[in-house]
């Protein structure tokens, strides 16, 4: 007898596993990209010449709380997927934007009172709040727990 018409409801093809892996990698890429943008924005507000490891940690912590609230995530994920499908020349002048460690300004928090733009003030207030409360924050989801554990492993 042929039972090929019976399905379990669970796809076990390599294609679906590959698609899920690609989706997760795209989400992770978007998360990391947003975190670096947060870090860069903060460094610019501070008037420093480059991003330190501590800036990156601040940006990652900020993104844990903001990522799922961003209205453009779906479109941004589509953009990342399209970019990843294209063959890109990564040899752009990436070295032009790198500051040597010996020339990098030390991490220093900016005094919020020196910021004049309301949007920037809101960003820094949230950034500081998220970071300052990070050690006592209790993740509500498995994803948040994984992110917290990963970020806590960053040595500064």
Regions found by a protein language model. Give the residues of each.
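Intrinsically disordered, low-complexity terminal regions
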Residues: 1-50, 57-156
């Amino acid at each position: 007898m042929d039972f090929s018409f019976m399905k379990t409801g669970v796809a076990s093809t390599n294609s679906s596993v590959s698609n899920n892996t690609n989706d997760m990698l795209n989400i992770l890429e978007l998360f990391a990209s947003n975190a670096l943008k947060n870090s860069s924005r903060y460094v610019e507000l501070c008037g420093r010449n480059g991003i330190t490891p501590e800036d990156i940690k601040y940006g990652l912590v900020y993104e844990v709380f903001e990522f799922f609230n961003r209205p453009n995530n779906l479109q941004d994920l589509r953009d990342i997927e399209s970019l990843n499908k294209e063959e890109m020349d990564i040899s752009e002048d990436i070295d032009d934007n790198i500051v040597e460690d010996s020339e990098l300004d030390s991490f220093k928090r900016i005094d919020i009172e020196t910021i004049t733009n309301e949007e920037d003030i809101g960003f820094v207030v949230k950034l500081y709040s998220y970071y300052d409360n990070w050690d006592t924050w209790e993740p509500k989801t498995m994803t948040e727990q994984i992110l917290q554990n990963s970020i806590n492993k960053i040595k500064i």
